[in-house]
Amino acid sequence: MGIKGLNSIIQQQVPSAIRPREMKQFFGRRVAIDASMSLYQFLIAVRQADGVQLASADGETTSHLMGMFYRTLRMVDHGLKPCYVFDGKPPVLKAHELDKRTERRKETEQKLAELTEQAEIMKHERRLVKVEQWHVAEAKKLLGLMGIPYVDAPGEAEAQCAELAKKGKVFAAASEDMDTLCYRTPYLLRHLTFSEARKEPIHEIDTELVLQGLGLSQEQLVDLGIMLGCDYCESIKGVGPVTALKLIKEHGSLENIVEFISSGGNAKWKVPENWPYKEARALFLQPDVLDAEGVSLKWEEPKEEELIAFMCKEKGFNEDRIKSGIQKLRKGLKGGVQGRLDSFFKVKPKTTEQLAASARKAQAAKKTNQKGKVLKRR
């Protein structure tokens, strides 16, 4: 689900933190991609002309394989070095969100049985799409044969992507979920795995610019995300995005906000009973991840014969197209070795204290500018 309204806040308050990019601008960059999110996109978007998912001769869905093969090939062809990160065990706090998703699926299934118009049927069928374990297993097999590295995260994939980016193993984390920013990735790439047909630019979000522009520390950004609504707990009823940002700036932390509301700050706002915001905060600030220093990412020569056997003989893809793709893959992986000049210099991420100081400085500058405007009017 991500975090409701965070992208809108950044667009309105700090538009300069979101840069539209073309894929070629990431030549030589290593990028950690949220695999589960990508597979979900492929299962939704990669379809035949009649809207039905691609399938092999025995009727098994192959949309996830086509999406994974060709979108990865496109990235490599542009000089990117993609690696995929798969979800591990979800945190206990996420159980309520997963239960809600299951309930929504049941409601959709019931409604689907009552529909008669084909367009409505197709729309609701897409809402039932779910990434199964066999989709994941086949995607891993495909990546292994392509020579593309992947990481099995112990917990949330976005958190592991952010960990790899923080430690300099990759340039950025790629996901559609805005909660990736709360795990402190230096950069978040959105729309990276979208199809070319959608003509959506890649959005590169600079986390440090977001913090400076909003005048928040990393901890306060996490508290804002929890207030807006995340996968780990409910939000405060009656508090929208604008109010949430205002409260964080005025009171500094969720502890102070809860105290303010509980003491009668606003009768319309209601803090959920036994609200586990502290536990949710800990999941963002101390997530369950593999230490990036111990993770090895290697891009290897594709295994052509095994790849053709799997994709063509077993799954029914066109052999000439797969062979052509393998040649592009081989060429792209060799070309990516050239790399970028700035990849030879490891950028040391700022400490929590440095980020907090930057946020205070930005906030002070903003207040000074506002005072200057008032004096000019006088």
Curated annotation (Swiss-Prot):
GO terms under biological process:
base-excision repair; DNA replication, removal of RNA primer; double-strand break repair via nonhomologous end joining; gene conversion at mating-type locus; maintenance of DNA trinucleotide repeats
Query: Which portions of the chain have biased composition (kind: Basic residues)?
Result: 368-378
An example Gene Ontology CC term for this record: nucleoplasm
A Pfam family: XPG_N
Q: How is the cofactor bound?
A: Binds 2 magnesium ions per subunit. They probably participate in the reaction catalyzed by the enzyme. May bind an additional third magnesium ion after substrate binding.
Q: Where is the composition biased (Low complexity)?
A: 356-367
UniProt-annotated binding residues for Mg(2+) 1: 34, 87, 156, 158
User: Where, by residue number, does Mg(2+) 2 bind?
Assistant: 177, 179, 231
Cofactor names from the entry are: Mg(2+)
The subcellular localization recorded is:
Nucleus, Nucleolus; Nucleus, Nucleoplasm; Mitochondrion
Q: Where is this region: N-domain?
A: 1-105
SMART domains xref list: HhH2, XPGI, XPGN
Q: How is it modified after translation?
A: Phosphorylated. Phosphorylation upon DNA damage induces relocalization to the nuclear plasma.
| Residue span of region I-domain | 120-251
Q: Which CDD domains has this protein been placed in?
A: H3TH_FEN1-Euk (cd09907), PIN_FEN1 (cd09867)
UniProt KW keywords: DNA damage, DNA repair, DNA replication, Endonuclease, Exonuclease, Hydrolase, Magnesium, Metal-binding, Mitochondrion, Nuclease, Nucleus, Phosphoprotein
- Predominant localisation class: nucleus
Q: What functional role does this protein have?
A: Structure-specific nuclease with 5'-flap endonuclease and 5'-3' exonuclease activities involved in DNA replication and repair. During DNA replication, cleaves the 5'-overhanging flap structure that is generated by displacement synthesis when DNA polymerase encounters the 5'-end of a downstream Okazaki fragment. It enters the flap from the 5'-end and then tracks to cleave the flap base, leaving a nick for ligation. Also involved in the long patch base excision repair (LP-BER) pathway, by cleaving within the apurinic/apyrimidinic (AP) site-terminated flap.
**Name of this chain's protein:** Flap endonuclease 1
Supply the source organism for this entry: Eremothecium gossypii (strain ATCC 10895 / CBS 109.51 / FGSC 9923 / NRRL Y-1056) (Yeast)
